[in-house]
């Protein structure tokens, strides 16, 4: 497992300390959990936003493919 140095505001550290007491987990575990959840959310957001690339495009997707293939 790698290590990183992270600067956080005093307020965030205070909130982490409060969570540490509530959940009886070390700050390192809380931060790992938060980063894991963030990465999962980012991955899901990326997948759900992909169809939006074609949103508003009036051209039919199949017709677009045909045009591209005609260029070959």
Swiss-Prot record:
Cited Gene3D superfamilies: Met repressor-like
Underlying gene: yiiF
Protein name: Uncharacterized protein YiiF
GO-annotated molecular function: sequence-specific DNA binding
Homology family: To E.coli YiiE.
GO biological process, any: regulation of DNA-templated transcription
Classification via InterPro entries: Arc_rbn_hlx_hlx
Organism of origin: Escherichia coli (strain K12)
């Amino acid at each position: 497992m790698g290590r990183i140095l992270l600067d956080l505001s005093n307020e965030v550290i205070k909130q982490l300390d409060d969570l540490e007491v509530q959940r009886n987990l070390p700050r390192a575990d809380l931060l790992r959990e938060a980063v894991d959840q963030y990465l999962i959310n980012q991955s899901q957001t990326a997948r759900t936003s992909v169809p939006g690339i074609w949103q508003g495009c009036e051209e039919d997707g199949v017709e677009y493919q045909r045009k591209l293939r005609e260029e070959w």
